Amino acid sequence: MKFIIKLFPEITIKSQSVRLRFIKILTGNIRNVLKHYDETLAVVRHWDNIEVRAKDENQRLAIRDALTRIPGIHHILEVEDVPFTDMHDIFEKALVQYRDQLEGKTFCVRVKRRGKHDFSSIDVERYVGGGLNQHIESARVKLTNPDVTVHLEVEDDRLLLIKGRYEGIGGFPIGTQEDVLSLISGGFDSGVSSYMLMRRGCRVHYCFFNLGGAAHEIGVRQVAHYLWNRFGSSHRVRFVAINFEPVVGEILEKIDDGQMGVILKRMMVRAASKVAERYGVQALVTGEALGQVSSQTLTNLRLIDNVSDTLILRPLISYDKEHIINLARQIGTEDFARTMPEYCGVISKSPTVKAVKSKIEAEEEKFDFSILDKVVEEANNVDIREIAQQTEQEVVEVETVNGFGPNDVILDIRSIDEQEDKPLKVEGIDVVSLPFYKLSTKFGDLDQSKTWLLWCERGVMSRLQALYLREQGFNNVKVYRP
């Protein structure tokens, strides 16, 4: 099988040296992602495209799907590469490839040509289009908005029969820009802002301020791992978790109610800046949008920025909530965000929307900054690839089984889309579907006399959710790994 990778247009207008660097990085990223599917595949770069050739036909769909999620790719063409002799040979090969697709449909033919030939692209379009129209009685030519567009590419003595075109996510290849540290809470905003910086070519590390215990951190780990695995797995990144409960406690005890929100955000920026400096990261990323909450007015944002020299990027600053939620839905983080607890908004009953710098600084004089230094020093830094392994170590009390007993039921916790695409059927045992994001509210409604074997494709989510359910007092859960 063969795929032709077309570059994001902004890459093609770069200078020759920059364009070549971007293409080299994108080629390396593609190799890093696809080697998990087929170690024998070949990735070959050209000036205006990248070729991916693989032998394992069983991995075709997985490879195609992975390519559509790698930043820097505009679209992917799945092609059949065959030799040809003349225009009639091109027509005959196109007829075999497209006959079934064109039955009862309107169509047109579009050709791209490179090399020296005694015909033009338009000549091929007319010849092939006329031939298809004659040999497929139920099809008819329609040059504007046809049901099917027959795409052909001619290069020297090779014909590329395009079997399908699939849109990529665009943007710049990860690694072409410098690293950033995303302040991730697991909600709609931080997930989308992290994705936007990945799409713009940054390697995104994650910094999480834990205000809600182990269950909250587990949820945010899921979001960070999902974003990395789906869009950024070509690079290693860090997940840094900071226990911020002592800081919140100090704020609640000593800070005036109206100033709490701004001061909490200032403490987060201070802490994140220290983490960024430690790892040589150039900028912080937040999901703040102008006017969305009290701490996100221009006055308050300026005061928050003042505590650090580190650049703070806010890709969502002009977005409304509906737009952000739509983006979260597109990238697959909506379901995570809907069930994620939000702690930042509850610590102040009457927050100020226009904080005064002198008042903020006066309130901060009451704060014991050694607490902030201590929580940063004790921050837990994990390679995001080790989240699954670390979870397995944490869930020592959750049994992993590869078989089942008479009282067991398999609980498929994949998302609804994954379940519909690839239903789980296991002979000799009932399988119940309950997406992971509904476990916190719906697991208690299940028959608690049964033992529930949590299952997902890779086992990461099932381990994380097993830990969460154990913490909630459910002891009738195991992890199923056949």
From Swiss-Prot:
Function: Catalyzes the ATP-dependent transfer of a sulfur to tRNA to produce 4-thiouridine in position 8 of tRNAs, which functions as a near-UV photosensor. Also catalyzes the transfer of sulfur to the sulfur carrier protein ThiS, forming ThiS-thiocarboxylate. This is a step in the synthesis of thiazole, in the thiamine biosynthesis pathway. The sulfur is donated as persulfide by IscS.
Cysteines joined through disulfide linkages: 344-456
Enzyme class: transferase
HAMAP family (alphabetical): ThiI (MF_00021)
Rhodanese domain sequence ranges: 404-482
Location(s) in or outside the cell: Cytoplasm
SMART domains: THUMP
Entry EC number(s): 2.8.1.4
GO (cellular component) term, any one: cytosol
The family this protein is said to belong to: Belongs to the ThiI family.
GO molecular function, one term: tRNA binding
Transmembrane stretches, start-end: none
Major subcellular site: cytoplasm
Gene field: thiI
GO biological process: thiamine biosynthetic process; thiamine diphosphate biosynthetic process; thiazole biosynthetic process; tRNA 4-thiouridine biosynthesis
Catalytic activity: [ThiI sulfur-carrier protein]-S-sulfanyl-L-cysteine + a uridine in tRNA + 2 reduced [2Fe-2S]-[ferredoxin] + ATP + H(+) = [ThiI sulfur-carrier protein]-L-cysteine + a 4-thiouridine in tRNA + 2 oxidized [2Fe-2S]-[ferredoxin] + AMP + diphosphate; [ThiS sulfur-carrier protein]-C-terminal Gly-Gly-AMP + S-sulfanyl-L-cysteinyl-[cysteine desulfurase] + AH2 = [ThiS sulfur-carrier protein]-C-terminal-Gly-aminoethanethioate + L-cysteinyl-[cysteine desulfurase] + A + AMP + 2 H(+)
UniProt binding sites for ATP: 183-184, 265, 287, 296
The protein's name in its UniProt record: tRNA sulfurtransferase
Organism of provenance: Escherichia coli O127:H6 (strain E2348/69 / EPEC)
Keyword Disulfide bond attached: yes
Active-site residues, record numbering mapped to chain: 456 (cysteine persulfide intermediate)
Residues covered by the THUMP domain: 61-165
Keyword annotations: ATP-binding, Cytoplasm, Disulfide bond, Nucleotide-binding, Redox-active center, RNA-binding, Thiamine biosynthesis, Transferase, tRNA-binding
UniProt pathway annotation: Cofactor biosynthesis; thiamine diphosphate biosynthesis
